[in-house]
Amino acid sequence: APPGFTPFRIY
């Protein structure tokens, strides 16, 4: 997974 990947969106 890429370094900025998250299982949910964080804004």
Swiss-Prot record:
Domain of life: Eukaryota
GO molecular function ontology, one term from the record: toxin activity
Keywords: Amphibian defense peptide, G-protein coupled receptor impairing toxin, Secreted, Toxin, Vasoactive, Vasodilator
Gene Ontology biological-process entries: defense response; vasodilation
Function recorded in the entry: Produces in vitro relaxation of rat arterial smooth muscle and constriction of intestinal smooth muscle. May target bradykinin receptors (BDKRB).
Signal peptide: none
Localisation: Secreted
Name under which the protein is recorded: [Ala1,Thr6]-phyllokinin
Source organism of this protein record: Physalaemus signifer (Girard's dwarf frog)
Annotated site (Not sulfated): 11
Family affiliation: Belongs to the bradykinin-related peptide family.
Tissue: Expressed by the skin glands.
A GO CC annotation given for this chain: extracellular region
